[in-house]
Design a protein with these regions (language model features):
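Short, hydrophobic/aromatic-rich segments at coil-to-beta transitions
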Residues: 1-8
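Ser/Thr- (and often Asn-) enriched beta-sheet segments in non-cytosolic proteins
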Residues: 2, 22-24, 72
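Interaction modules related to DNA damage response and DNA replication/repair
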Residues: 12-14
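Short aromatic-glycine-(Arg/Gly/Cys) micro-motifs in beta-strand/loop hairpins
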Residues: 16-45
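A short, charged, amphipathic alpha-helix used as a generic interaction element across diverse proteins
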Residues: 47-68
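Intrinsically disordered, low-complexity charged/polar segments
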Residues: 66-98
């Protein structure tokens, strides 16, 4: 499992994250899990099967266009300390769906 992109959006009462996790490791097409949620709520997922890196980047660019800021793992730990734990639960579930 590999992070492809993590974004954070905070405006008014909205405080949420959106991320894309690479579930497979093939040369061209891969499976990704989009993971999102508001802080303090359960994360949701959507599997994107057999897409290339360009399509994965396109999904991330759409989030940036909507106001999400790219963050690294250190910043993620500050804005959503439970994310790693919640992600592990969600990612295991997502991999079982692939």
């Amino acid at each position: 499992m590999k992070y492809h992109w993590i974004g954070h959006f905070k405006e008014g009462t909205s405080d949420k994250v959106w991320g894309l996790i690479r579930l497979t490791d093939y040369p061209r097409y891969n499976d990704y899990a989009a993971v999102w949620g508001r802080r303090g709520r359960a994360l949701q997922t959507k599997i994107h099967s057999d897409i290339d890196a360009w399509d994965a980047d396109k999904l991330c660019n759409k989030k940036e266009d909507k106001g999400y800021t790219v963050i690294d793992l250190a910043r993620l730990d500050q804005v959503y300390p439970e994310f790693e734990e919640d992600l592990q639960k969600t990612a295991v579930w997502a991999m079982l769906k692939v």
